[in-house]
């Protein structure tokens, strides 16, 4: 409606065979939690299909396009919302060039099967614009990240998760679940940050810090500088199936530093074992 289109009227009159839902107009960055509720409501009681489109632009130093785990996360969320289909909505899809590699064939093979996706590794992330993608002119179309982090002002982010982690934990299939929050320009030892998942404070006993200040890789210096706050989640802190809320609060900041802080990335990674008691490296280093 923002663009002046009467989509609901077209659907009711049977003029539309399907709606392809995207997180942006074109070249959208990775969004593993595209909300299909409005489209499902619009098409309820009609023959119009709801298809979930996935943009693979990641705009990050490590990966320019979505990893297989991100694709699986987005596909699983689409199926969980009863989408009629899920597809890659880019002009072309060659993450590692042409021809496709076995990694790509494995990634694409799973996206149509909720059963295969259920215990596929996932990488969920809050959509982030990143340094290479300009702001979106469409009202409401700009991604949630990055966001300025001010002292005492909580930031809350929605994170949609398709996994039934309680079920798979009980079956011995969950290897680990990790929540990562990347904050730019911050020095962790001089500033107090609190992270919550569904209003549950994640304690320092779960925290692993990753310093991105003056880090060099084979692809050049890591930027922007800052820290990643990574939490290894125990079962009683697992995200729930469906909507989750990640809250980031700067409790106290170093008064001697005037640089603005930003929440740059929010990621949740789920790693599965292929079956109970399965070790990925059964022989260890010696083998």
Predicted stretch roles:
Residues 184-278:
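Beta-strand-rich ligand-recognition modules
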Residues 39-68:
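Active-site clefts of carbohydrate-active enzymes
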Residues 167-180:
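Extended extracellular/luminal ectodomain segments enriched in beta-structured repeat modules
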Residues 147-170, 227-231:
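Short beta-strands within extracellular/lumenal beta-sheet-rich domains
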Residues 160-162, 178-184:
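Short edge beta-strand/loop segments characteristic of extracellular beta-sandwich folds
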Residues 18-29, 54, 63-127:
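Substrate-binding cleft of secreted/luminal carbohydrate-active enzymes
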Residues 15-16, 44-50, 82-84:
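Short, well-ordered coil/turn segments that N-cap beta-strands
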Residues 28-42:
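Active-site-adjacent beta->alpha loops and helix N-cap segments on the catalytic face
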């Amino acid at each position: 409606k923002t663009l002046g289109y009467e989509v609901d009227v077209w659907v009711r009159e049977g003029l539309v065979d399907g709606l392809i839902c995207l997180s942006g107009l074109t070249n959208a960055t990775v969004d593993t939690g595209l909300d299909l509720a409005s489209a499902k409501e619009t098409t309820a009681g009609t023959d119009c299909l709801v298809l979930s489109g996935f943009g693979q632009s990641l705009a990050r130093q490590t990966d320019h396009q979505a990893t297989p785990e991100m694709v699986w996360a987005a596909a699983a969320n689409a199926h969980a919302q009863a989408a009629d289909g899920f597809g890659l909505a880019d002009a072309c899809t060659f993450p590692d060039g042409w021809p496709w590699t076995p990694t790509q064939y494995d990634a694409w093979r799973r996206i149509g099967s909720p059963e295969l996706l259920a215990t596929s590794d996932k990488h969920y992330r809050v959509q982030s614009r990143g340094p290479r993608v300009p702001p979106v002119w469409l009202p409401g179309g700009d991604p949630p990240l990055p966001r300025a982090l001010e002292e005492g002002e909580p930031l809350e982010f929605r994170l949609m998760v398709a996994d039934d982690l309680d079920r798979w934990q009980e079956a011995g299939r969950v290897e680990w679940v990790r929540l990562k929050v990347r904050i730019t320009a911050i020095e962790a030892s001089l500033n107090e940050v609190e992270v919550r998942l569904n209003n549950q404070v994640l304690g320092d006993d779960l925290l692993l810090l990753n310093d991105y200040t003056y880090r060099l890789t084979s692809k050049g210096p890591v930027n922007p500088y800052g820290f990643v706050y990574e939490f290894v989640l125990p079962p009683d802190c697992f995200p729930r199936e469906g909507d989750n809320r990640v809250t980031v609060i700067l409790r106290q900041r170093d008064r001697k530093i005037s640089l603005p802080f930003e929440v740059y990335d929010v990621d949740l990674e789920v790693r599965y074992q292929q079956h109970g008691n399965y070790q990925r490296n059964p022989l260890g280093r010696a083998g």
